[in-house]
């Protein structure tokens, strides 16, 4: 069940930071289509001026390592939607600024170390009346909502297992590719008896039916391994995805080389292989399936699937702006929050093109 929202008397506009990035620009364009008027922000003055001029929006130039400029950028806004990753490096200065200014913090991160760091500031955020809600994109809104939906169907659940599959020519946005590289050194994580810990088995696989027959999925660390525990209280959580054969082979190699991945220069070499993001045409040809199952260890089971658009841009933009619109209406809850904790399991169903089925 969603937490009771508390009204806000703050301004009804928001800062879109990282607006000239791949996802940030898509976010800005969709804002205009919806009639929203964010203040665009980032560190690239020329790119910001060009985009804001084209879209008819205000802009503010500030780098994350310039605290005074960042504070000035937050004047007169009620929230920040932070779209400039990797958030392992960019989240903290923006969270600091939001807490100083009393401004609500949203981001589209998927990095569990970010979630841990933000959650650790829960008491500070509550004291200042600020909502801290990372992960308002595809990671983790659809899965967070599905997890809460399944817990509602089986309140006795003690195990949550989730998986997702992308079908079509769409690839990962450049920022997501860089984030994946940064997370390689952390290894796979699972939730066991409430504890957030390293997975004991390498490259664990299982079979999942996303709606057209069983396929093999491989365990990975998705954001819900951290966040779904807060949203549902379920103590055991695993997540999986469909990986092409080449990707599985690459992950096997990366596990062997994991100690080297802690070195910045090694990750810098890997970042040279980051590819351009998928075009609008390729995204339009791509769909995403999400599967979830809960069990209670004594025979109880509930499962469901979500079907929606391309995940990295289209579904991310839809989810993030669904949250932004609610924040601008004053529907906020101070402290560290997950999307479904505040807005409930039906939040994802407000995104165009999303369907859900019980299985």
Q: What is the predicted role of each segment?
A:
Residues 17, 152-296, 300-303, 314, ...:
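Active-site-lining helix/loop region of Rossmann-like oxidoreductase modules
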Residues 14-34:
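N-terminal Rossmann NAD(P)H-binding glycine-rich loop of SDR-like oxidoreductase domains
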Residues 39-40, 106:
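Conserved beta-strand positions in the Rossmann-like core of class I SAM-dependent methyltransferases
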């Amino acid at each position: 069940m969603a937490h009771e929202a508390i009204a806000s008397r703050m301004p009804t506009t928001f800062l879109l930071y990282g607006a000239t990035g791949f996802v940030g620009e898509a976010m800005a364009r969709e804002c205009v289509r919806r009639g929203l008027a964010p203040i665009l922000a980032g560190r690239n003055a020329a790119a910001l001026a060009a985009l804001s001029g084209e879209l008819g929006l205000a802009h503010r130039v500030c780098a994350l390592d310039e605290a005074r400029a960042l504070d000035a950028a937050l004047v007169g806004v009620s929230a920040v939607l932070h779209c400039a990753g990797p958030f392992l490096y960019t989240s903290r200065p923006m969270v600091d600024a939001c807490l100083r200014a009393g401004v609500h913090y949203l981001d589209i991160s998927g990095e569990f170390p970010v979630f841990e760091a933000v959650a650790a500031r829960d008491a500070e955020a509550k004291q200042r009346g600020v909502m801290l809600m990372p992960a308002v994109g595809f990671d983790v809104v659809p899965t967070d909502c599905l997890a809460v939906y399944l817990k509602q169907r089986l309140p006795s659940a003690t195990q949550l297992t989730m998986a997702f599959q992308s079908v079509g020519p769409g690839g990962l946005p450049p920022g997501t590719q860089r984030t994946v590289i940064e997370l390689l050194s952390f290894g796979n994580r699972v939730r066991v008896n409430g504890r957030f810990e390293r997975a004991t088995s390498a490259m664990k696989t299982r079979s999942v039916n996303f709606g057209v027959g069983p396929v093999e999925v491989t365990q990975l660390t998705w954001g819900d391994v951290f966040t779904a525990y807060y949203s549902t209280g379920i103590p055991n959580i695993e997540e999986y995805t469909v990986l092409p054969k080449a990707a599985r082979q690459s992950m096997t190699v990366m596990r062997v080389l994991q100690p080297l991945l802690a070195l910045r220069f090694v990750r810098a070499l890997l970042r040279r292989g980051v590819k351009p993001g998928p075009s609008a045409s390729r995204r339009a040809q791509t769909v995403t399936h999400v599967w979830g199952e809960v069990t209670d260890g004594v025979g109880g089971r509930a499962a469901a699937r979500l079907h929606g658009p391309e995940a990295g841009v289209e579904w991310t933009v839809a989810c993030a702006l669904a949250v932004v619109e609610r924040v601008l209406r004053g529907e906020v809850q101070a402290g560290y929050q997950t999307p479904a904790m505040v807005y409930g399991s039906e939040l994802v169903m407000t995104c165009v093109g999303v369907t859900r089925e019980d299985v």
